[in-house]
Amino acid sequence: MLDKNVSKLINEQINKELYSAYLYLDFSIYYESQGLDGFANWYMIQAQEERDHAMLMLKYLQNNGE
């Protein structure tokens, strides 16, 4: 079982990762609407990467009794 402070910090980081993912998704949508498909694609990839980070930390918490 994780220390409560460590668990709290990991949860805060998960929230930051998901916030970043939504922000990058918003950027992707904007750039796509402007016809800048390269930028849109890059931000979509970044959004997925941030979601992946959040899921790794979530699985870590689940595997450690949280």
Please give the residue ranges for each predicted region.
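Iron-associated oxidoreductase/ferritin-like identity signal
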Residues: M1-E66
